[in-house]
UniProtKB/Swiss-Prot annotation:
Record's GO cellular component terms: endoplasmic reticulum; endoplasmic reticulum membrane; membrane
Protein name: GPI ethanolamine phosphate transferase 2, catalytic subunit
Function: Catalytic subunit of the ethanolamine phosphate transferase 2 complex that transfers an ethanolamine phosphate (EtNP) from a phosphatidylethanolamine (PE) to the 6-OH position of the second alpha-1,6-linked mannose of a 6-PEtn-alpha-D-Man-(1->2)-alpha-D-Man-(1->6)-2-PEtn-alpha-D-Man-(1->4)-alpha-D-GlcN-(1->6)-(1-radyl,2-acyl-sn-glycero-3-phospho)-2-acyl-inositol (also termed H7) intermediate to generate a 6-PEtn-alpha-D-Man-(1->2)-6-PEtn-alpha-D-Man-(1->6)-2-PEtn-alpha-D-Man-(1->4)-alpha-D-GlcN-(1->6)-(1-radyl,2-acyl-sn-glycero-3-phospho)-2-acyl-inositol (also termed H8) and participates in the eleventh step of the glycosylphosphatidylinositol-anchor biosynthesis.
Annotated SUPFAM superfamilies: Alkaline phosphatase-like
Consequence recorded when altering residue 344 to L: In NEDHSCA; uncertain significance
Length: 983
């Protein structure tokens, strides 16, 4: 069976997406879960260690507090309370910590540090995984056991005001609630006022047991202007006033209740130096946790060095405080200072309940639980506890009793710590079988792509895929039988659950058939290669073709990037690798231009994709012999040398272009500091987004939009030009409406809205331009001779994507878009055309620049840099599919725009029937190499110290990038099929 190179590459990438999906499902482990049902009272709590018939405490201890108020301030990092900002802007909170009856901690959140997983950790005590980052966009109902579920089952009345994520996680759990949206980050005032306005009314009432307040304003300020914004201090002062009001009210009501009240101040996650969150930096994982109650002994607190605890400890502590069962999936331990004022017997009882719950969870998730040090400590603690009870029943007051009780306490606390660590470590249990299946599929695809290079890059760009030979069929059925046998053996002997084993036989069989077919094709292609004995050449069609310095740079650069993925520091700072590669590429292009225009060509030019310019377009093809045609001024003239064609100013522009591109890249590096090592350092982006420089940002945004229009409109139809101009004007109006930039005639306007109308105004023009481009492409299939119509159609699709990117980019990132278009223009006019690069080289250059611009946007391999606000531009409610697509495009706009420009360039500047196929194949290959290498690396490094903080987020990025590549290859193939239809 014969397939075009592009179609073949697209099929390979689609299969590779399936393989990486299976690998990701196996790599990100299932969380630790209890098999017991989460119903209140489904089973009685474990009795206290028996010391005779007189000790039979089988009921839950009574609650320690009458009412509990939880004030959760989104993105409240620890130094906002315990640092200089807290002393300055939160004086009442500081007073409570230093002199009041309170216990202060730094609660460490595990990555991913985004809101929904952190709420789950606080209320269930379990450790959410990275898959919760995706679910965070649309939080579904939480089915796990939690403090909220237990409180509702116990008949407690819960009132909630704040982030609507809680309402989605706990539907029908609140007797009263008012949810606020968290996606309009430009709103940091009204979103908190909507919470505070309920306080006076609800505090006067006494018909509730738990009050939860979730304030979003601080998080929104961080997303807008970072942690050093002057707005941070104002918001902290506002929160301090709220805390004082609540605390004063609770104190005044304690005379009416037999038990004291508890006020909890905490954050869900912190805030990075760029104002975002999601990763594992100290600023993102450390949050304050302050427990305030008159039940606590008044003693000075250390505001500078509070004790560090785990965020998962909050669930167990709240459950004990409210007299509820500890959530069954909790891996946290009781914060002992909360109960240290209680009698010794109650303290031991609380600790025993916690260790019993953790030991049960350990038994259900660890086959060899009896050998676990924590379980052994637990059993020893129980025995000592029994001895203490026996002594307690004999004599209630003695020094021996106190000393033994203190020993039991220490033993329980050690057991709690060890059990919690053991259970947390279970999160790192991997589904090796699923990982191996995914790895094998990806390896087979990469091997097939590498073996197909000689055929795929020939002039016809076609491959012979042997599927019907008798040898193929015999090998295929043999491999199917072997894989089926392995699957049965693994799935019937696996001790732990396996995702791939849980699939239906139809789905698992389909994957095995696919893997078998790929292996058979690889064997057939490898046999042909070995029999043919061909050695790799740049041009498989011509034996004398040679490798240029640029080709060697591409090979060495790709290999160097792949090798760098094995080091955590290089993964964190991957942007440096791409900056180095594009800078080196510019220097290599500069050398090539100087050699061509000053030294001249010493011999015939290298063979490859050569451009011939005519007044209706240009042609290019892989040549069968030396002497490629060069750039022509007129179709009817001869083929003068490059130095004869390009003279005067145009020649100097060719020579200067690499250096201009270098200058642009240097400016863009200063715009957004990314990575880890230098992310905290000031950059132009921070300077522009500060409230003191809104005028400068407005001017820069307007100039960038003007440059975008000038560079894009040249290839558009008149209708699309008008739509583009109005759309870019709408982009500025949208940013002005939400308060990011200013209108010249309203410099001091404080009328800030969500910009819904303005954004939808732009969407209309985006869809209109894309529709016009698609219409022209379809028309070009009917009118085969109208080559210009297809060129205009492709450019209009590209223009629509540029307009969409302009809408989604933050104002300070609009220069990134403008410089991207400028560099594409310079490369097209002064480098790719005159220097006669082939399709493979042009494709790799587009890929490299696309990757560099991914990081120029401020992205990194850190989840915290994903701008989720892009997914909600123009939306007044959450709509899942548009939100996900817009967020993905906003994040990967750089690679997508460079890939779409590549399609237009190869379709319009060349008429080679193989150019698009070659480009699609090269694009798939250069993306597949790092994907396979990285999944092998993360498999071997799965127990590395930084596997969750560094390597796992990068793995998610690689998976998403592969999905984007698959979409790009589909577009390549569609355009290539258009060419085949016309021919």
């Amino acid at each position: 069976m014969r397939l075009g190179s592009g179609t073949f590459a697209t099929c390979c990438v689609a299969i590779e997406v399936l393989g990486i999906a299976v690998f990701l499902r196996g790599f990100f482990p299932a969380p630790v879960r209890s098999s017991a049902r989460a119903e209140h009272g489904a089973e009685p709590p474990a009795p206290e260690p028996s010391a005779g018939a007189s000790s039979n405490w089988t009921t839950l201890p009574p609650p320690l507090f009458s009412k509990v108020v939880i004030v959760l301030i989104d993105a409240l990092r620890d130094d906002f309370v315990f640092g200089s900002k807290g002393v300055k802007f939160m004086p009442y909170t500081t007073y409570l910590v230093e002199k009041g009856a309170s216990h202060s901690f730094v609660a460490e959140a595990k990555p991913p540090t985004v809101t929904m997983p952190r709420i789950k950790a606080l209320m269930t005590g379990s450790l959410p995984g990275f898959v919760d980052v995706i679910r965070n966009l649309n939080s579904p109902a939480l089915l796990e056991d939690s403090v909220i579920r237990q409180a509702k089952a116990a008949g407690k009345r819960i009132v909630f005001y704040g982030d609507e994520t809680w309402v989605k996680l706990f539907p029908k759990h609140f007797v009263e609630y008012d949810g606020t949206t968290s996606f309009f980050v430009s709103d940091y005032t009204e979103v908190d006022n909507n919470v505070t306005r309920h306080l006076d009314k609800v505090l006067k009432r006494g018909d509730w047991d738990i009050l939860i307040l979730h304030y979003l304003g601080l998080d929104h300020i961080g997303h807008i202007s970072g942690p050093n914004s002057p707005l941070i201090g104002q918001k902290l002062s506002e929160m301090d006033s709220v805390l004082m009001k609540i605390h004063t009210s609770l104190q005044s009501k304690e005379r009416e209740t037999p038990l004291p009240n508890l006020l909890v101040l905490c954050g869900d996650h912190g805030m990075s130096e760029t104002g975002s969150h999601g990763a594992s930096s100290t600023e993102e994982v450390n949050t304050p946790l302050i427990l305030i109650s008159s039940a606590f002994e008044r003693k000075p607190g250390d505001i500078r060095h509070p004790k560090h605890v785990q965020q998962t400890d909050v669930a167990a502590t709240l459950a004990i405080a409210l007299g509820l069962p500890i959530p069954k999936d909790s891996v946290g331990s009781l914060l002992f200072p909360v109960v240290e004022g209680r009698p010794m017997r109650e303290q031991l009882r609380f600790l025993h309940l916690n260790t019993v719950q953790l030991s049960k969870l350990l038994q259900e998730n660890v086959p060899s639980y009896e050998k676990d040090p924590g379980f052994e400590q637990f059993k020893m603690s129980e025995r000592l506890h029994g001895n203490w009870i026996r002594l307690y029943l004999e004599e209630k007051h003695s020094e021996v009793l106190f000393n033994l009780g203190s020993k039991v306490l220490r033993q329980y606390l050690d057991a709690l710590k060890t059990l919690s660590l053991s259970l947390s470590a279970q999160v790192a249990q991997y589904d090796i079988y699923s990982m191996m299946v995914g790895t094998v599929v990806v390896l087979e695809v990469l091997t097939l792509l590498l073996l197909s290079v000689p055929q795929a890059l020939r002039r016809k760009a076609e491959l012979e895929v042997p599927l019907s030979s008798p040898g193929f069929s015999l090998l295929f059925y043999l491999v199917i039988l072997v894989l089926s046998a392995v699957h049965v053996i693994v799935c019937t002997s696996a001790e732990s659950s396996c995702y791939f084993c849980g699939l239906s036989w139809l789905a698992a069989g389909g994957v095995m058939v696919l893997a078998s077919a790929l292996l058979c094709v690889i064997v057939s292609v490898l046999t042909n290669v070995l029999v043919g004995g061909n050695t790799p050449r740049k041009n498989p069609m011509h034996p004398s073709s040679r490798w240029s310095e640029l080709d060697l740079l591409i090979l060495l650069g790709t290999a160097g990037h792949v090798l760098s993925l094995g080091a955590s520091s290089f993964v964190e700072e991957e942007h440096q690798t791409w900056y180095f590669l594009v800078n080196t590429l510019c220097l290599a292009l500069s050398q090539e231009t100087y050699r061509n225009y000053f030294l001249g060509d010493d011999g015939e030019p290298p063979c490859g994709l050569c451009v011939e310019q005519g007044h209706d377009g240009a042609t290019a093809a892989w040549q069968d012999g030396p002497g490629c045609d060069v750039l022509e001024r007129d179709k009817g003239h001869g083929s003068p040398s490059t130095s004869e064609v390009l003279r005067g100013r145009e020649k100097w522009m060719v020579l200067a272009s690499p250096w201009l591109i270098l200058a642009c890249c240097r400016l863009l590096r200063s715009l957004n500091q990314t990575g880890v090592q230098w992310a905290h350092r000031p950059d132009l982006g921070h300077w522009l987004t500060s409230s003191d420089h809104k005028a400068e940002l407005s001017v820069l945004a307007a100039l960038s939009l003007l440059v975008v229009f000038v560079l894009v409109q040249r290839g558009c139809s008149p209708v699309s030009k008008a739509a583009l101009a109005l759309g870019l004007l709408g982009v500025y109006c949208y940013r002005a409406a939400i308060g990011s930039v200013r209108f010249p005639w309203r410099p001091d306007s404080k009328d800030i809205s969500k910009g819904i109308i303005e954004a939808r105004f732009v969407y209309v023009f985006v869809l209109g331009i894309l529709f016009t481009g698609t219409k022209d492409l379809l028309k070009s299939q009917v009118i085969a001779a109208d080559f210009k119509l297809k060129t205009v159609g492709l450019w209009e699709i590209y223009s629509g994507l540029v307009l969409l990117a302009a809408l989604l980019f933050r104002p300070h990132n609009l220069p990134v878009l403008a410089f991207s278009l400028l560099i594409q223009t310079l490369m097209t006019k002064f480098i790719w055309k005159p220097l006669r690069h082939d399709a493979a080289e042009i494709t790799v250059m587009h890929y490299w620049f696309g990757q560099a611009f991914f990081y120029f946007q401020g992205n990194s391999n850190n989840i915290a840099t994903v701008d989720i606000s892009a997914g909600f531009v123009g939306l007044d409610t959450y709509v899942e599919i548009p939100a996900v697509l817009l967020t993905a495009f906003g994040t990967y706009a750089g690679p997508v725009l460079w890939a779409s420009h590549l399609v237009h360039f190869l379709s319009s500047e060349t008429r080679s029937g193989s150019a698009l196929s070659h480009a699609c194949f090269c694009y798939a290959l250069i993306c597949s190499i790092p994907v396979f290498t990285y999944i092998v690396l993360v498999t071997s490094l799965r127990y590395h110290l930084f596997i969750w903080s560094v390597f796992s987020p990068k793995l998610l990025y690689e998976g998403m990038h592969l999905l984007i590549t698959a979409a790009v290859c589909v577009f390549f193939t569609a355009m290539d099929q258009t060419r085949l239809t016309q021919s």
